[in-house]
Swiss-Prot record:
Originating organism: Caenorhabditis elegans
Stated name of the protein: Abnormal cell migration protein 13
Tissue: Expressed in pharyngeal-intestinal valve cells and ventral cord neurons.
Secretion signal span: 1-20
Organism phylogeny: Eukaryota, Metazoa, Ecdysozoa, Nematoda, Chromadorea
Membrane topology, Cytoplasmic segments: 259-362
Annotated TM spans: 238-258
Disulfide topology: 36-68, 98-136, 183-195, 190-208, 202-224
UniProt gene name: mig-13
């Protein structure tokens, strides 16, 4: 059970389902479709898209000495809204004037046919309409401008001096304002009177001005197929509560198991210094420990004085013949007494003791 819960958690973290991405284009690209052009002969048509300042956005600063013009055209009946997701363009101290590198926005005064590359009027070639915005500096997630009809023209130019700024990443989308407040089939209602194409509601970018198209429940109600789901935010509160309780109980059970295991291992480990045979000892197996002490040494007697010229010698106490009438017991005791008795010197100067000599020799 614990392994299954861990697998679900890892799956919810690592799982990133496919989400619909708008088509990405570049002001200053490497191929012919994204080539920088200085005239109104390049168009991007559709419901929405992403637009980068240059092909190596995020890797290198934008290119210098660029003069690129690009037209955005939506289906007839829709307007265009441009949002800056990331914007980093070098500017002067007064960012309102944007005297150096600048992105200009022009609003067309007439409706353009998205199916035709020929302009509706010849004047559109040289005059895309009034300028409604110019941008530089640094900001994020900001709506730049909204068109009056179905077309906007963007003009991006950079000076030859160079800059370390990253450039910009724009998202443009189409919408229309419903007079009745209702959207037709194939559209998504933003809830504020705006309607957007259902394809735009199923991506991960805000096409509604209020961001209503990023709510997962609204996307699922619109039958969006390719949406990025977060399991922890799309499930019900009861499921989240049960899932959390299961994780907590599993952790408590694991902690209790570890504690019991440690307790069992501690009880089986023998104590240091304890005897392993405490109940099976017998009298035959018992061996007393040797004593941890030694008997005291005998006292040392002082050596005989060198001042005396007398050298002790062994006297023969039995120089004469023994009396035959003495009993064997008397003879034995007399011999023992003579052997260990104290003998005096003839002169009476020094007493010789056999035991003392033996002790000194030891």
């Amino acid at each position: 059970m614990t392994k299954l819960l861990i697998a679900l958690i890892l799956f919810s973290i690592c799982w990133k389902p496919y989400s619909a991405e708008p088509i990405a284009s570049f002001f200053d690209g490497l191929d012919s479709r994204n080539e920088c052009k200085a005239r109104l002969d390049r168009r991007l048509t559709g419901f929405s898209g992403l637009l980068y300042s240059h092909s190596k956005y995020g890797q290198e600063p934008y290119n210098t000495s660029r003069n690129c013009v690009l037209m955005l055209v939506a289906p007839i009946g829709y307007s265009i809204r441009v949002r800056a997701l990331q914007f980093d363009v070098a500017s002067t101290e007064n960012a309102r004037t944007c005297e150096k590198d600048t992105l200009h926005v022009f609003d067309h005064e007439t409706t353009l046919d998205p199916e035709s590359y020929a302009p509706a009027r010849i004047d559109d070639i040289t005059s895309p309409g009034p300028i409604i915005g110019q941008f530089c500096g640094h900001f994020e997630n900001r709506i730049l401008n909204t068109s009056s009809h179905n077309a906007l023209t963007l003009w991006w130019h950079s000076n030859p001096n160079g800059s370390n700024s990253k450039g910009f990443k724009l998202h443009w989308g189409s919408f229309r304002v419903s007079k009745t407040g209702n959207c037709v089939t194939g559209e998504f209602s933003c809830g504020n009177g705006e309607c957007i194409p259902i394809e735009s509601a199923c991506d991960r970018f805000a096409d509604c001005s209020n961001g209503e198209d990023l709510i997962h429940s609204r996307q699922m109600a619109a039958n969006c197929q390719n949406i990025e789901l977060d399991p922890l935010t799309t499930v019900s509160g009861v499921f989240v509560l049960l899932f959390s309780a299961t994780i907590i109980l599993s952790l408590c059970g694991f902690i209790m198991f570890v504690c019991c295991l440690c307790k069992c291992l501690k009880s089986t480990i023998p104590i240091k210094g304890a005897s392993s045979h405490t109940t099976t000892t017998t009298a035959t197996d018992y061996k007393p420990d040797p004593p941890q002490f030694y008997p005291p040494s005998p006292p040392k007697m002082p050596p005989p004085s060198a001042a005396s010229s007398y050298t002790p010698r062994l006297h023969h106490h039995f120089e004469g013949p023994l009396v035959p009438s003495e009993t064997s017991a008397f003879h034995s005791s007399n011999r023992m007494q003579n052997h260990y008795s104290v003998n005096s010197d003839i002169n009476g100067d020094y007493t010789y003791v056999r035991n003392d000599v033996h002790r000194n020799l030891l």
